[in-house]
Structure formats: structure tokens, C-alpha cells
UniProtKB/Swiss-Prot annotation:
Keyword check for Transport: no
Protein name as annotated: Glutamine--fructose-6-phosphate aminotransferase [isomerizing]
Taxonomic source organism: Brucella abortus biovar 1 (strain 9-941)
NCBIfam families the record matches: glmS (TIGR01135), PRK00331.1 (NF001484)
Listed HAMAP family: GlmS
Length: 607
């Protein structure tokens, strides 16, 4: 969600802050700003909208100084306008914040009763005034922040800059991630390693309750009990090449075309294609002792989890619950200690998913995670971590992270099946071989981009779209609908095809496109029956199938997208591509901001 950067160094800081903020754009934002110290005096520049507006402001009104903080804001409290943008300042400090201060109304009422004037609608301004209040009592900046943190309820990552002190940055974390970066005679704070990549690859992640005091020469970290602690220092894998779109129009398009390569890398991490076996050393879980699996996630990751449910149940004969994290965490679900709790998150910082993990951990369950950021909080709090080797995903709408999540969990399903005796060695080799072929089939689908883009001219003119699928194509239908909603802003819904007669069929008329995901598998004839019901009511069908399915459908369609024939096991990996491309090219035709769609954030670090 919001992005934070803080730098204390020896070079002009404003351009460095803006550079870092550009790397945080993928998180989603609606305004931006920076503050610096020069000769002990605080100054700031803010702008509504994109960073280019802030850059224009800085071109006319430069901000000198070698220490500063910056922020990209995703509005939670207060409208997305300049006066609500961060940093917020008082006569004594500047502060930036990612998260939600749940008791801000109570704090604001108390501070206003003391005569303090609020200029914004944000929860963050209450933090600025609260710390200023302690400074005015004669406390040092370190003492003031330390004494205020226990009074803040909710989720927050904070960075402070203090009037008159060019040797000090303070950061604090409770919920949203915050990393410390180590340089030569300079130090950094950032929401993630990507923001810090131009400056350092040496970082530490603060844990919940930590607060950090940075000078040019190093950092002192304290836990929630104000005891000095050390956090592991690690090398970040992110590099400066990450911000390039290459020859592609958008990051999303680039990331779609990266899928064959990153899926290959992810699969090779778990499977030995030479022997046709699972790499047991990469698994770290004894599935023979697991009697039930709970997979919990949000958004696109939840749809990946739901596909995986089919795999684990059908191949490994392992009962699975797939849950939306924001619901699971409040259900107070009874859990067996012989269950395995698995959590899926691209960022590894998704707030509801992390809270669900901690609930399961408190119940004594073994914790596994499928994450794309191996240094993330979810990864650090897991007993077993299964990385998706997708590389950084900049587009807000997930593409390659989704298919890499599928790849990792497909591999785990084979491992579970073998460990539980549900398949023999020959079947294991068959399934591993099928997965090894997935990147080749995906490359064939990518060559259909122009054909798929042509279908989108009609899609871009409608207001509603229905997606249908059966089996593993049902969660793909939900994912396809989500993609279209996210980036084209067209209302779309994904349904199990067998549910058509239980309500959605009432929506069908000649204005309603219905996208049907229907590989010619054992469920194909059932899906054809549903298509006939749509056609009988004038619905316009876009059929995504293979050659065999296209030849046997005998139904007039608005368009038919013919994919290569693939084994049922890997069809979700292959059929994910056309639903991504349909959403992408529809959004391009509609002129939306594909990589940073309105109101959305890449990493949802608050409830």
C-alpha cells in the first residue's frame, strides 16, 4: 500500500528520494511527497496524483539537504488530495506513515482539546502532534517516539525527521513492513528491498514492535519492550534492472511474457526433470503425517489456492480447505494439530494472511508458506517456505506470481501424493513430465496474443461480463473476472458453470458476453450443455478451449480461442494466459492505467 523511504547520507537527497519512490509506485498510490532538512530547517513538497507532478513541483521549488523522508500515499483516512499527502509536519518534526491508526479519533480529540490545530483529515497527523507534544515537554526525539508508540493502536510503519537534527532518522514498525538499509557513511529506511535497491543490497527487516534509531554510522534497533535487539542482516536479490519494461508497453505485458521462464525456474526448484521425481530436499514437509490441509490467501493468491485444492484432493487424496484470509481469521475454526496450514502471498506481507498464519500458529499447527519474497514476514514466521521464483512483479494485477504459485503447489501436490502412497513412481514421473512441458505450451499461447487482442475490441464496449468454468477452470473463471475488474473497470463475475441455472442465467441476454473456460477434459460435455443454455438466451460466448473442444462444440460463438491440447493436470497453468491477455488488451483499449489501476495496491498490508 503506501510506500516509505528515508535516507540519511552525504549527497543531495531529494533526487534519491524520488528515485526510490518510483520503485514503490507498483504498491499503488494517489499522492506523493518528500521532506528534507537543510541547516536544521524542515521543508517539504507534496503533489496529488502521479510522481511526475511531484517532480514538476521540485523542478520549480527545489529541496536541498542530505537527509530526508518520502512517501507515496494510498488514501485510507481523508481524500486523495495534496493537503492530505505525506509527509505531515509540525514545528518540530516530519512524519510519513503506512497503515491505519485505529484510535486516531480518540487521539485527535485529546490533542484538539489541548488546543492543537489539525490541518488534514488523516490519521497520521495525530501521530505528528502526539510526538510533538512529548518533544515540547523537553524529551529528546528518541524519548518522544519511544513514549508515544505504546499509545498507537492499529497497524503502522513510521519514519520521522526532526527539526534541528540532521544526524537522526527514526523508524517504527507494527504490522506493515519496514526495512533498514546499510550503506557506507549513510543509512536507509524503506518499505521493501526494491525501494532500497539503488542504494544498498544489505538490509535488515524490522519485526513487529521494533523501532530503529538511524545515524550516518549505523542503526540501533529496539523491540516493543525497548530492549536493544539485533535483526539478521541479509543480502537483497533485487537489482536496478527491475524498473525496466524492456520492449513492452506495460509491466503487466512484460510479466505475462516472462511466465515460461519463471515457471521453469520455479518448477526446477522442486522437480528433477532428469529423473522425473520430486526433489525431496526442497519439500521439508512430511505429508504422510498430514491428515488435512488448510490453504489460506487473498485475491489472486486465493484463486491459486483453490486450484491447488483440486490437485491435492484428486492426486494426493488429501482433504483441503481453501479459505479467504479476511474471513478465516475471524471464523474461530476448530483446527487439528495434524493439519498443515499453508499460506499463499506474493509479497509475504498481506495483513489478513499474516494474521491468519498467527492464529494457526497459536493453535499449534505446522506452518508452510508459498511466497515470492523470501525475506518477508510470512516467510520468516513459517516452518517451511516454498518460494515462487517469479522475480519482482511490478504490475498491480498479478500474472507471473499467480502461475508460479500454481507451479509450486502443483509440485507440492505430487510430493504429497507420493508421500501418502496415493501414486506410484510411474505416475509421479508422468506428472513431473507434464509439468515440465507447461512452459512450452505457454509459449505457444503467447503467440496467440494478436488473435486474443482482436477479441477485446468487443469486450471494451460492454459493461458486464460473465466467466464460467468447471473443475479447476472454475477458480480460473473467478481469476479471469478479477483481472478484468482490476484493470479495465468492467464489472465481471466468475461462476461455476453448473451454478448457471441457480441465478446467473437471469443476467443472460444479447448484450452479455460470457467467457467460457472449457478444455476438452472429462467435464467438457457438461460445460457444453451450459453453453447451449447461454446461446439459447442470446448470450455472446467467447470460448477458450483446444482444437478438439472447438471442433465438437457445435455452438455459435462470438469468438473461439483455440489453445494447444494439454493434460488436465496442467491446464490451469496454460489457460491462465488467455484470461490475463483478455483483461490486459481490454484495459489498453479503454485507456486505463494498466500497471497502477485506480484504488488498488499491490501489497495490502492493512485490513
Amino acid at each position: 500500500m503506501c510506500g516509505i523511504i528515508g535516507i540519511i547520507g552525504n549527497d543531495e537527497v531529494a533526487p534519491r528520494l524520488v528515485d526510490a519512490l518510483k520503485r514503490l509506485e507498483y504498491r499503488g498510490y494517489d499522492s506523493a511527497g518528500i521532506a528534507t532538512l537543510q541547516n536544521g530547517r524542515l521543508d517539504r513538497r507534496r503533489a496529488e496524483g502521479k510522481l511526475v507532478n511531484l517532480e514538476k513541483r521540485l523542478a520549480g521549488e527545489p529541496l536541498p539537504g542530505v537527509i530526508g523522508i518520502g512517501h507515496t500515499r494510498w488514501a485510507t483516512h481523508g481524500r486523495p488530495v495534496e493537503h492530505n499527502a505525506h509527509p505531515h509536519i509540525t514545528t518540530r518534526l516530519a512524519v510519513v506513515h503506512n497503515g491505519i491508526i485505529e484510535n486516531f479519533a480518540e487521539l485527535r480529540a485529546m490533542l484538539e482539546a489541548e488546543g492543537r490545530k489539525f490541518e488534514t483529515e488523516t490519521d497520521t497527523e495525530a501521530v505528528a502532534h502526539l510526538v510533538t507534544r512529548e518533544l515540547e515537554k523537553g524529551k529528546s526525539p528518541v524519548e518522544a517516539v519511544r513514549d508515544c508508540l505504546p499509545h498507537l493502536k492499529g497497524a503502522f510503519a513510521l519514519a520521522f525527521l526532526f527539526e534541528g537534527d540532521e544526524e537522526l532518522l527514526i523508524g517504527a514498525r507494527q504490522g506493515p513492513p519496514l526495512a533498514v538499509g546499510y550503506g557506507e557513511g549513510e543509512m536507509f529506511l524503506g518499505s521493501d528491498a526494491i525501494a532500497l535497491a539503488p542504494f544498498t543490497d544489505t538490509i535488515s527487516y524490522l519485526e513487529d514492535g521494533d523501532w530503529a534509531v538511524l545515524t550516518r554510522n549505523g542503526v540501533s534497533i529496539y523491540d516493543e519492550n525497548n530492549k536493544p535487539v539485533e535483526r539478521p542482516v541479509q543480502k537483497s536479490q533485487n537489482t536496478n534492472m527491475l524498473v525496466s519494461k524492456g520492449n513492452h508497453r506495460h509491466f503487466m505485458q512484460k510479466e505475462m511474457f516472462e511466465q515460461p521462464e519463471v515457471i521453469s525456474h520455479t518448477l526446477a526448484n522442486y522437480l528433477d526433470f532428469t529423473t522425473g521425481k520430486v526433489r525431496k530436499e526442497a519439500i521439508g514437509i512430511d505429508f504422510s503425517k498430514v491428515d488435512r490441509l488448510t490453504i489460506t490467501a487473498c485475491g489472486t493468491a486465493y484463486y491459486a489456492a483453490t486450484v491447488a485444492k483440486y490437485w491435492f484432493e484428486q492426486i494426493a487424496r488429501l482433504p483441503v480447505d481453501s479459505d479467504i484470509a479476511s474471513e478465516f481469521r475471524y471464523r474461530e475454526m476448530p483446527l487439528s494439530k495434524d493439519s498443515l496450514a499453508m499460506f499463499v502471498s506474493q509479497s509475504g506481507e498481506t495483513a489478513d494472511t499474516l494474521a491468519s498464519l498467527r492464529y494457526c500458529k497459536a493453535q499449534g499447527l505446522k506452518i508452510a508458506s508459498v511466497v515470492n519474497v523470501t525475506g518477508s514476514t510470512i516467510a520468516r514466521e513459517s516452518d517451511a517456505v516454498f518460494p515462487t521464483l517469479a522475480g519482482p512483479e511490478i504490475g498491480v494485477a498479478s500474472t507471473k506470481a499467480f502461475t508460479c504459485q500454481l507451479s509450486a503447489m502443483a509440485s507440492l501436490a505430487i510430493a504429497a501424493a507420493r508421500a501418502r502412497g496415493a501414486i506410484d513412481e510411474v505416475r509421479e514421473q508422468e506428472l513431473v513430465h507434464q509439468l515440465s512441458e507447461a512452459p512450452r505450451f505457454i509459449n505457444q499461447v503467447l503467440k496467440l496474443e494478436d488473435q486474443i487482442a482482436a477479441v477485446c475490441h468487443d469486450l471494451s464496449k460492454v459493461n458486464h461480463v460473465l466467466y464460467l468454468g468447471r473443475g479447476t477452470s472454475f477458480p480460473l473463471a473467478m481469476e479471469g473476472a478479477l483481472k478484468l475488474k482490476e484493470i479495465s473497470y468492467i464489472h465481471a463475475e466468475g461462476y461455476a458453470a453448473g451454478e448457471l441455472k441457480h441465478g446467473p442465467i437471469a443476467l443472460i441476454d444479447e448484450t452479455m458476453p460470457v467467457i467460457v473456460i472449457a478444455p476438452s477434459d472429462r467435464l467438457y460435455e457438461k460445460t457444453v450443455s451450459n453453453m447451449q443454455e447461454v446461446a439459447a438466451r442470446g448470450g455472446r460466448i467467447i470460448l477458450i478451449t483446444d482444437k478438439k473442444g472447438a471442433e465438437s462444440a457445435s455452438i455459435d460463438t462470438m469468438a473461439t480461442i483455440v489453445l494447444p491440447e494439454v493434460p488436465e493436470f496442467i491446464s490451469p497453468l496454460v489457460y491462465a494466459l488467455p484470461i490475463q491477455m483478455l483483461a490486459y488488451h481490454t484495459a489498453v483499449l479503454m485507456g486505463t492505467d494498466v500497471d497502477q489501476p485506480r484504488n488498488l495496491a499491490k501489497s495490502v498490508t492493512v485490513e
